Amino acid sequence: MWDNDFCVDFTVSLTAASLDTKMEVRNTGDKAWDFQAALHSYFDVSSLKNIEVAGSFAGATYLDKMLDPPSDQTEAREALTISEEYDRVYKGVNDCTLKDSGKGKALAINNNAGWKDTVVWSPYGDEGMGFDSFLCVESAAFDAQTLEGGASWVGELSLVPGGL
């Protein structure tokens, strides 16, 4: 399937305060290769109309994958709301908070290492997918990561629940 030597370890730790993940990608061969990675996290929400994704989005460059062809844009908003089909890669935005006023809860998405970008995706309007009951907020390493022979890359994520 892929002719490069590698090993991937994925660790999940659950405490009273957070859910923590660590993904380690190791090049176990001699030749360098590139890879991309993302954690496709689908979060249960009360309704998209109650959702805000807060973070350092204002001024950030994002790849709008809904455009044909996809192109880079600049985000004007500090907090994101979803009212249409959405597929964007926010480059350099690695921490954010998912706020759900319908549940009165918030979830801090803290990318502690490796994950440099955030992907926000919603199939808004697709009833068959239950679009109004979830939002995908992915921790990503969108640009190619190069691993030399024997080298490794680590991505660490903490999900910390809280109130509004």
Model-predicted regions and their roles:
Residues 1-35, 39:
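Acidic, contiguous internal or C-terminal segments within carbohydrate-active enzymes
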Residues 30-117:
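Active-site/ligand-binding surface loops and adjacent short beta/alpha elements
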Residues 12-16, 25-29, 41-47, 141-143, ...:
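Beta-strand elements of well-folded, non-transmembrane domains
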Residues 85-164:
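Beta-strand-rich recognition/accessory modules
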Residues 22-24, 54, 138:
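Beta-strand residues in well-ordered beta-sheet regions across diverse protein folds
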Residues 3, 45, 128-129:
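Solvent-exposed alpha-helices and their adjacent loops that cap or buttress functional pockets
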